[in-house]
Design a protein with these regions (language model features):
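Pocket-edge structural micro-motifs
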Residues: 9-11, 32-34, 296, 300-303, ...
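Amphipathic alpha-helical protein-protein interaction segments
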Residues: 10-13, 17, 23, 40, ...
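Residue-level marker of intrinsically disordered, low-complexity segments enriched
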Residues: 3-8, 34-35, 228, 233, ...
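Catalytic cores of histone-lysine modification enzymes
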Residues: 142, 146-310, 315, 349, ...
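N-terminal alpha-helical interaction blocks
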Residues: 1-38
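C-terminal SET catalytic tail plus cysteine-rich post-SET Zn-binding segment of SAM-dependent SET-domain
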Residues: 19, 36-171, 175, 303-416
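General secondary-structure edge motif
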Residues: 3-4, 87, 279, 379
Length: 416
């Protein structure tokens, strides 16, 4: 596949970024990418059945809508049979203990080849380190969730399997240590911001359980506290929030119906469930997790982004879409935070609903909490926005919007 972007040096401040190799028009796909590793959040998987590998939402659309809206009966969704014919769920596969579910034999095979062969546990043994790890994590990291320790377990398992294939330790670890993560980012403080203050007192317990479950004497450096903190910071600062929903996929199918009158009637029918969903489920409407992406990781932030992240395939494959015209040679940028875009197209409305579910970025939940605490309105004031980026992403934003705001402030200040 020919790439439409290239990784290149942007500046000493930004370091590497992505530049367009062609012109793009609004709503044009720039690229799509599978994660190098991903995982569903722990509490979330108790309520949203999904593929343990690709995070495909496995709940039938009508059942999902009934549960999310609190309906007493299963809704009779229009064109549901046409949808299922186009997007068949297929057979579901599990591992021997039944704790992991896969949407296909292909996903199951990939999972076991990459990491699951080292992560299977006896579900009847509550003392297994990985099961204890899950319970410990859930004891202090409550919904809305922003991370999971199983992502680190999968990373370690992937590295160990690479060693078994004859790959050197340095080469096996390289993909996970190449994310932006300098010395100041490795401080425990940034981990606390993304997770919970209680985490500081539990970090040794979490680390020890991972060591107990997965230690490999061939790579002792992978199991030090220092490396553990680096991996945690990598996830906190670089992981992309993922959200999938079979009902959302069905809704997208309805919006793409060719007959406008039939489409509007179907959408009107679905609209009647909105209040029920808000009352019954609030922000918890998607299968949620996070993942690390090899190309996506190079996309820098702008408060006036020219691109946007979406998940339109009902799995963990990320899609990067142009929001405005992009010229060849121009840097591709996204917003790391919710900027309350005023675009009202169907796709952006759907994306905004997804953001409200706490899935748009690895720390979307922290952002919402911070805004509530500060009593902010719909639009983040310029200085508050920059302060948030400094605090949670450890950089000073100098995008065109920030520079404009600072210049306008300076002019006003001088006049006064």
């Amino acid at each position: 596949m020919t790439l439409n972007v290239e990784v290149c040096w942007i500046s000493n401040e930004k370091e590497r970024g992505l530049k367009a190799l062609k012109d793009f028009v609004p709503e044009e796909e720039i690229f799509i990418e599978d994660p190098i590793v991903s995982c569903q959040f722990l509490y979330n998987r108790q309520y949203f059945p999904g593929c343990s590998y690709c995070m495909k939402s496995l709940e039938e659309p009508e059942n999902m809508l009934q549960r999310l809206s609190g309906c007493s009966e299963v809704p009779n969704l229009p064109f549901i049979y046409d949808y299922k014919e186009k997007y068949p769920q297929g057979d579901v596969y599990t591992n021997e203990n039944g704790l992991e579910v896969y949407c296909s034999q292909e996903c199951k095979d990939k999972a076991y080849k990459e990491f699951q062969n080292l992560l299977d546990v006896d579900g009847r043994d509550p003392e297994h380190p990985l099961l204890k790890l899950e319970e410990l994590w859930k004891s202090f990291h409550y919904p809305p969730e922003s991370a999971t320790p199983i992502l680190i377990a999968r990373i370690i398992a992937i590295i160990r399997n690479k060693l078994d294939q004859g790959v050197s330790a340095e080469e096996a670890m390289a993909p996970f240590l190449s994310f932006k993560n300098d010395k100041k980012n490795q401080e425990i403080g940034i981990i606390q911001k993304f997770l919970d203050e209680k985490f500081e007192t539990r970090i040794k317990e979490v680390h020890q359980l991972i060591v107990d479950a997965l230690y490999d004497p061939r790579i002792p450096e992978l199991f030090t506290m220092s490396t553990f903190q680096v991996l945690l910071c990598t996830i906190c600062l670089n992981a992309q929030g993922i959200g999938t929903s079979n009902f959302e996929n069905y809704s997208r199918f309805i919006r793409n119906l060719p007959d406008s009158s039939i489409k509007e009637t179907a959408l009107d029918y679905l609209d009647q469930f909105n209040d029920g969903i808000e009352e019954e489920s609030g922000m918890f409407t998607h299968l949620e997790g996070s993942g690390l992406y090899a190309l996506h990781k190079h996309i820098n932030h702008s408060c006036e982004p020219n691109a946007q992240i979406r998940f339109p395939f009902n799995n963990n494959k990320v899609q990067v879409i142009a929001l405005k015209p992009i010229k060849k040679g121009e840097e591709i940028t996204i917003s790391y935070i919710d900027l309350d875009d005023d675009c009202d197209c169907d796709e952006c409305e759907e994306y905004e609903e997804f953001e409200e579910a706490g899935c748009s970025s690895s720390n979307a939940n922290n952002e919402e909490e911070a805004r509530e605490e500060e009593g902010e309105g719909e639009e983040i004031p310029g200085e508050d926005r920059r302060s948030y980026l400094r605090e949670y992403y450890l950089f000073e934003c100098h995008c065109s919007k920030c520079q404009r705001e600072i210049e306008e402030y300076n002019k006003t200040h001088k006049k006064n």
